[in-house]
């Protein structure tokens, strides 16, 4: 076996190396590894006996020539069954620990000489054998080896220079070579003409020579011009390349900014969607609460309307002095029955929900102009009637206070009477509104007394039951202002703001509706209450006036005046409630429309 020297460039674990394998006298294997980045070198010399011993220890014996051929084949990657790897001492310890059972190797100090291990692996059909070759680090390389490297590098430089010259010569221009060939052809042609044209005169030869020289100069000028154009084109191309690179960098920067802005926009869209979802959930919860509140109010209203009935009580004579409770005359039993039956019929017809359409047809809308005209007519008629009547006796304190504000438009909280809810069978009114059968009226009232004419006059000019109450008035004043009769004076069959509640009569159960109940808070229920009480009041007043023969003419005139005032206040109240209902409906419609448009826009 002759001496071998092979140099191969290989990469191990991302680092480039130069591997040199050589044999000395066929008995010694020399392996040199050089790192290309910092020229670090590792070297190892192995005798044939050493190689055969390590192959025998692995269990797969190989002779020295066979081992060298296997190593060269692995370096050149000529065979798939043999390959090499370059490992450090730490890498070798990690491999040993993996084979031992996956435990981490104990910490050790770094081994001296900074060794490297060239591992040649032979993969058989059912076996894999590793042959390690330790390489020592060379701190002081051999001078002979350095000289050999220098000479090798010089030869490589010369080869590269020759190759660059050939490339540069090829880039000079094919046009220059063509011109040179053409010049040589012209020179040969000139020589031929000189030899063949012996008979031609010297003048002709000189003229042809001058012409050829002129053509030669023209060709050279064209050559120089073409070279200048080529150089200018190359400079322009380089400039365009620079502009293109700058444009690419600018476009890449803009693209990155747009990507960042797109991410921010997506984040904002996600936050807005979450906000829309939250607002939608809040709106749905609010709608559910409103629907549940409406259902509760309707249930309370139906229960209250079903449980409220008109009371029937016999008429009792008054047993005391005249007081605030004698504002109304007590009608007869028949008149009271007729008024209660009419009140029940009216309330049952208007007990349905305000939102539902009437049976007879659509309800006419409120006309403010017509309302003002009718009110003026009623006021003028009432003023004329009062002037023609005889003077009336003085009024009580509660009656004067209640009637002083008739004709003015009270606030919405003061136009409706207080509504209280209680059980139809077991009602417990407050101390100022409690009735005791067989005795006087509520606390603070005086017993109704006096002659029938005084009662007639008090009932004829009694206060409007729907006039606003004064906060500072006494309980008796409030009861008189709202038209509550006394227990002994007119509480038996007189008109009351409660359909089923006479003061101390037979059917006076004293039902009242609490002002804090859901029924009183609903505008539609308040409207129904107003209509029912108006009908009951008109029926009761009409029956009482027909039953009294002594004060028929005077009571009729005052009843018309009181009716006009009641209808005026009730109409104003209805208009106010109607405007509030329309405002509430518009608000709900706008809220739903804005929510729907926002959801559609975001989607």
Swiss-Prot record:
Subcellular compartments: Cytoplasm, Cytoskeleton, Flagellum basal body
One example GO MF annotation: microtubule binding
CDD domains: HD_CCDC61_N
Presence of keyword Coiled coil: yes
Region (Disordered): 288-526, 539-564
Compositional bias annotation for Gly residues: 486-510
Compositionally biased intervals (Basic and acidic residues): 288-297, 364-380
InterPro entries xrefs: CCDC61_N
Composition-biased stretches (Polar residues): 397-406, 511-520
Low complexity composition bias: residue spans: 337-348
Effect of residue 273 to E: Does not restore flagella formation in VFL3 mutant strain and does not affect localization at the cilium basal body
Effect of residue 266 to E: Does not restore flagella formation in VFL3 mutant strains and does not affect localization at the cilium basal body
GO cellular component, one term: motile cilium
Keywords: Cell projection, Cilium, Coiled coil, Cytoplasm, Cytoskeleton, Flagellum
GO terms under biological process: cilium assembly
Coiled coil: 169-289
Family: Belongs to the CCDC61 family.
Function: Required for normal flagella and striated fiber formation.
Domain notes: The coiled-coil domain is involved in microtubule-binding.
Protein name: Variable flagella 3
């Amino acid at each position: 076996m002759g001496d071998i020297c092979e140099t191969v460039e290989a990469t191990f674990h991302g680092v480039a190396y130069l591997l040199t394998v050589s044999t000395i006298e066929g008995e010694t294997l020399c392996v040199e590894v050089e790192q290309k980045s910092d020229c670090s070198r590792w070297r190892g010399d192995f005798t044939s006996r050493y190689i055969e011993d390590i192959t025998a220890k692995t269990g797969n014996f190989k002779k020295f020539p066979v081992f060298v051929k296997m190593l060269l084949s692995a370096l050149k990657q000529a065979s798939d069954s043999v390959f090499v790897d370059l490992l450090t001492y730490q890498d070798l310890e990690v491999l040993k620990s993996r084979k031992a059972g996956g435990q981490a190797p104990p910490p050790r100090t770094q081994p001296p000489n900074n060794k490297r291990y060239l591992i040649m692996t032979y993969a058989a059909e059912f076996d894999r054998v590793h042959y390690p070759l330790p390489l020592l680090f060379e701190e002081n390389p051999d001078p002979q080896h350095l000289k050999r490297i220098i000479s090798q590098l010089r030869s490589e430089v010369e080869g590269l220079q020759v190759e660059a010259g050939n490339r540069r010569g090829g880039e000079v221009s094919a046009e220059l070579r063509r011109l040179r060939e053409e010049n040589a052809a012209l020179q040969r042609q000139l020589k031929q003409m000189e030899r063949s044209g012996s008979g031609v005169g010297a003048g002709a030869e000189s003229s042809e020579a001058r012409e050829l020289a002129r053509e030669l100069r023209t060709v050279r000028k064209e050559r120089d011009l073409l070279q200048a154009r080529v150089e200018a084109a190359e400079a322009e191309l380089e400039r365009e390349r620079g502009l293109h690179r700058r444009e690419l960098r600018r476009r890449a920067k803009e693209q990155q900014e747009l990507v960042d802005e797109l991410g921010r926009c997506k984040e904002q869209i996600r936050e807005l969607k979450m906000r829309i979802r939250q607002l939608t959930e809040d709106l749905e919860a609010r709608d559910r609460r409103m629907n549940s509140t409406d259902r509760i109010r309707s249930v309370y209203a139906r229960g209250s309307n079903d449980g409220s009935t008109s009371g029937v009580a016999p008429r009792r004579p008054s047993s005391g002095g005249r007081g605030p409770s004698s504002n109304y005359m007590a009608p007869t039993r028949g008149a009271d029955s007729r008024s209660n039956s009419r009140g029940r019929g009216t309330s049952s017809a208007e007990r349905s929900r305000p939102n539902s359409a009437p049976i007879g047809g659509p309800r006419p809308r409120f006309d403010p102009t017509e309302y003002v005209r009718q009110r003026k007519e009623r006021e003028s008629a009432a003023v004329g009637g009062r002037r023609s009547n005889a003077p009336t006796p003085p009024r009580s304190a509660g009656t004067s206070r209640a009637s002083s504000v008739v004709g003015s438009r009270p606030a919405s909280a003061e136009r409706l009477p207080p509504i209280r809810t209680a059980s139809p069978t077991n009602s417990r009114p407050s101390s100022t509104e409690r009735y005791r059968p067989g005795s006087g009226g509520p606390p603070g009232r005086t017993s109704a007394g006096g002659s029938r004419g005084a009662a007639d006059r008090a009932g004829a000019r009694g206060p409007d039951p729907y006039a606003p109450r004064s906060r500072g008035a006494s309980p008796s004043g409030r009861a008189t202002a709202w038209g509550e009769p006394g227990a002994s004076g007119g509480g038996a069959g007189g008109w009351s703001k409660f359909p089923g509640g006479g003061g101390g009569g037979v059917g006076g159960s004293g039902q009242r509706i609490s002002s804090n109940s859901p029924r009183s808070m609903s505008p539609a229920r308040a409207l129904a209450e107003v209509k029912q009480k108006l009908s009951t009041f008109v029926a009761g007043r009409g029956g009482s006036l027909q039953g009294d023969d002594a004060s028929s003419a005077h009571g009729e005139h005052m009843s018309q005046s009181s009716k006009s005032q009641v209808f005026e206040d009730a109409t104003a109240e209805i208009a106010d409630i109607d405007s509030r209902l329309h405002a509430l409906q518009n608000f709900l419609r706008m809220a739903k429309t804005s929510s729907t448009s926002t959801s559609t826009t975001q989607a």
